[in-house]
């Protein structure tokens, strides 16, 4: 355990170092810490012995170690902090016409990446928590059709498929009827379960040959189990990490799994400092924040960057963008649920 003065010294070194990326000496600390230079140097030496500070090779100053950054995050960083200077810029950047949910999520991801110079990832509501609220099949030709699904009464998912060779028009109608009877208004996780239990038994009542029918069910509904992921600033990862992080960001489904694991049950925000279970993220910091998607649940806003990032500003930007995004989404869903022709 460190003393209050040592904690103040560590916090100030973290603040100065993340702004300048230069080692911090006792003289720079004396302007804020009300103690002699010798006392400050003694405390810095103790912090170094504890592994919270490191010596610079080219200077007598000190800089935070990964353990020092982690201590700062766990003991001094407020995860709900907001810097009012950035609010106007974020609101102004969000002033655009969005035609669908994905436009706003992608925009938010780009804004965060551009304002930090790091990598931003945004996830839609977790697939398992969404519900199938609409389903239709549109025959495009004699040989292919389009399954049109609606999740949470607002999110469309379309899957084009080749009509099985032995299918007649009545078979497509039966396929749609089974979905409406057994899967409509079910959660995605329940659909996954029913496809393995109920549906094989039901299909036998409607079809003589069931193999290609069950394959069709699996193909059409497999899209629902995938995370909707928006990555921005991927190239930025090369400036603060190695190629493994850059390549990992290509696997969006695995990225989504890792980010969801970074939040404990019931947590709204977290900061991991070189603490991810994923090897490609083991030497970086990951800030994760839940934001409200009205009527549907929570999305995830994450920032991936270097261990020596400016945590106060990064947390502030994540909070601001999360709040502005939630407000924009609220307006968007209110518009979808309103009478399009009403006079405002």
From Swiss-Prot:
Record-annotated disulphide pairs: none
GO annotation, biological process: negative regulation of DNA-templated transcription
Pfam families assigned: HrcA, HrcA_DNA-bdg
NCBIfam families: hrcA
Family named by the database record: Belongs to the HrcA family.
Function: Negative regulator of class I heat shock genes (grpE-dnaK-dnaJ and groELS operons). Prevents heat-shock induction of these operons.
Cross-referenced HAMAP family: HrcA
Protein name: Heat-inducible transcription repressor HrcA
Phylogenetic placement of the source organism: Bacteria, Bacillati, Bacillota, Bacilli, Lactobacillales
Gene encoding the protein: hrcA
């Amino acid at each position: 355990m460190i003393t209050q003065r040592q904690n103040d010294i560590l916090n100030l070194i973290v603040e100065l170092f993340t702004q300048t990326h230069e080692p911090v000496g006792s003289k720079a600390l004396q302007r804020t810490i009300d103690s002699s230079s010798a006392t400050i140097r003694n405390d810095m030496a103790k912090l170094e012995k504890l592994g919270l500070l490191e010596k610079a090779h080219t200077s007598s100053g000190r800089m935070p170690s990964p353990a020092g950054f982690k201590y700062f995050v766990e003991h001094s960083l407020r995860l709900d902090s907001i810097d009012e200077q950035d609010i106007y810029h974020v609101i102004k950047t969000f002033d655009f016409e969005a035609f669908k949910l994905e436009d706003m999520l992608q925009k938010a991801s780009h804004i965060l990446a551009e304002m930090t110079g790091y990598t931003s990832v945004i996830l839609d509501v977790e697939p398992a928590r969404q519900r199938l609220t609409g389903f239709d099949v549109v025959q495009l030709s004699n040989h292919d059709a389009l399954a049109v699904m609606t999740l949470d009464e607002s999110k469309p998912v379309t899957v084009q498929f080749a009509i099985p060779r032995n299918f007649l028009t009545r078979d497509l109608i039966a396929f749609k009827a089974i979905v409406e009877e057994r899967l409509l208004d079910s959660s995605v996780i329940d659909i996954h379960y029913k496809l393995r239990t109920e549906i094989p038994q039901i299909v036998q009542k409607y079809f003589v040959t069931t193999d290609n029918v069950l394959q069709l069910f699996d193909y059409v509904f497999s899209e629902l189990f995938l995370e909707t992921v928006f990555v921005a600033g991927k190239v930025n990862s090369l400036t603060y990490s190695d190629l493994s992080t850059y390549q990992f960001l290509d696997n969006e489904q695995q990225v989504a799994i890792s980010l969801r694991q970074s939040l404990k049950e019931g947590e709204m925000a977290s900061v991991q400092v070189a603490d991810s279970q994923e090897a490609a993220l083991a030497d970086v910091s990951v800030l994760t924040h839940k934001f409200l998607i009205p009527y549907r649940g929570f999305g995830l806003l994450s920032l991936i960057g270097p261990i020596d990032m400016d945590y106060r500003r990064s947390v502030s930007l994540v909070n601001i963008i999360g709040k502005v995004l939630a407000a924009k989404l609220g307006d968007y869903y209110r518009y979808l649920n309103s009478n399009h022709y009403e006079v405002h």
